């Protein structure tokens, strides 16, 4: 639900970097973003293809960087990683810690964590700069838990 809402408002050039343990819902969040961007059809984690691009309201690159640890900049360029961060596209990166130096400075960081007493719940922590503040804060405020 939150992923879909953000996808409906995601501006061109936005990059979201999602980190969290296995099973925390990174791919489920990507599916919500894709729905919000008007992308029909299945969205799956591109674990072995590294990058999957979809067409919706805006082009959407879904990156799974889990297997990209230690790759050099030239190798990442060969698979089209830098193309995902063009201003006309949107991008969602799972396991961003493996390619952090290659992400744009204004990347929105999302951390997904388990909630100990509620195993089916997730805590979502967003970190973003002032560029994202104007469009993102009004969307997240109703979900803020004090």
Task: Map each language-model feature to its residues.
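Pre-Walker A adenine-sensing motif
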Residues: 1-9
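Short phosphate-coordinating micro-motif centered on Lys-Gly-acidic
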Residues: 71, 81-146
């Amino acid at each position: 639900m939150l992923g879909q809402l953000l996808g409906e408002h995601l501006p061109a050039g936005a990059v979201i970097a999602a980190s969290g343990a296995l099973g925390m819902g990174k791919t489920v969040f990507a599916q919500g973003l894709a729905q919000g961007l008007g992308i029909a059809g299945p969205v799956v984690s591109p674990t072995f293809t590294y990058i999957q691009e979809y067409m919706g309201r805006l082009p959407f690159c879904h990156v799974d960087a889990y297997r990209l640890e230690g790759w050099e900049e030239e190798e990442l360029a060969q698979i089209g990683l830098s193309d995902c961060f063009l201003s006309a596209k949107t991008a969602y990166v799972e396991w961003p810690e493996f390619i952090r130096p290659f992400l744009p400075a204004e990347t929105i960081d999302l951390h997904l964590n388990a909630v100990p007493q509620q195993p089916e719940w997730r805590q979502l922590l967003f970190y973003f700069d002032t560029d994202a503040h104007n469009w993102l804060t009004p969307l997240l405020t109703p979900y803020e838990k004090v």
